[in-house]
Design a protein with these regions (language model features):
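Intrinsically disordered, low-complexity terminal regions
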Residues: 1-264
């Protein structure tokens, strides 16, 4: 038997989306029309609404013990949402598509997947996390700080990328970035960077003291550290990599101009 759900439609020009959830599967995806909507289970502990331009979803308490995980779905139209804020415990979070300003997530444990998403910046803080960022454009920064984390970024652009964890492996595949720092006290780091080797200042430190450093000034910087583990770095020479920053800026400016025209 299907769970009963409630659909809440909000103002499409929301300035923020805010969630406070626990033991839930949360999906934030691109809407098929211009409606900003939330689908939540019919339950006493879950509610949704809007206030002063902020769409919110909150759980007043945890679901009953041994009950099925609650499913929450938010559909976002194709325009910029200036802020996405999420405070979660034991949740699976998926952001698929959309254009955002600042994305801020605090998650005690669970999985976070960001795919085909544009954002000015993404910041994730938490405890035990499995994080996957794929085919996304982060104009500003990607910042992750977790107690334990398995991290993977694929085919993604980030002006600045910083990932720190006490324990866990990190992998990046075809990441285009000007500056990247990966740090784990216990884990392996595998990185494939877009660009030519000679364009990067490279510094890697592994096994408590084995350091390799260029000691140079170049257009891009990559730093990696592991106290217990190994570091492998490779490069993909892609002529388009140098232009992605310009393309990202043009795309963001075009989106902002479109929003300003709509507002006027």
């Amino acid at each position: 038997m299907k769970d009963k759900v409630c659909i809440f439609n909000a103002e499409s020009d929301a300035t923020a989306i805010e969630l406070n959830v626990c033991d839930a599967d949360v999906t934030i995806n691109r809407a098929t029309d211009s409606t900003l909507s939330v689908t939540i289970p019919v339950a006493k502990n879950v509610n949704a609404g809007s206030d002063k331009g902020t769409l919110y979803v909150s759980q007043t308490k945890r679901p009953p013990l041994f009950s099925r995980r609650q499913k929450i779905e938010i559909s976002v139209p194709e325009h910029i949402v200036p802020a996405l804020r999420l405070n979660a415990r034991h949740c699976n979070i998926s952001v698929e598509g959309g254009i955002y300003g600042e994305v801020n997530m605090i998650c005690e444990s669970g999985t976070i997947r960001i795919e085909n998403t544009d954002a000015d910046s993404v910041e994730i803080n938490g405890g035990r996390l499995d994080i996957d960022v794929e085919s996304s454009t982060l104009k500003g920064s990607l910042y992750i700080n977790a107690r334990t984390a398995e991290f993977l970024a694929q085919n993604t652009f980030a002006g600045l990328a910083v990932v720190r964890t006490r324990k866990g492996n990190m992998g990046i595949v075809a990441l285009n970035t000007k500056e990247c720092t990966l740090e784990t006290d216990d884990g392996n780091i595998t990185a494939t960077l877009k660009g030519k080797r000679e364009d990067f200042c490279l510094k890697t430190t592994e096994k408590a003291g084995n350091t390799v450093a260029d000691g140079c000034l170049k257009s891009k910087n990559f730093n990696a550290y592991t106290a217990k583990g190994s570091i492998v770095v490779d490069f993909i020479e892609d002529e388009r990599a140098a232009d992605e920053l310009a393309f990202a800026d043009e795309g963001q400016n075009a989106n902002l101009s479109e929003e300003e025209n709509k507002a006027s």
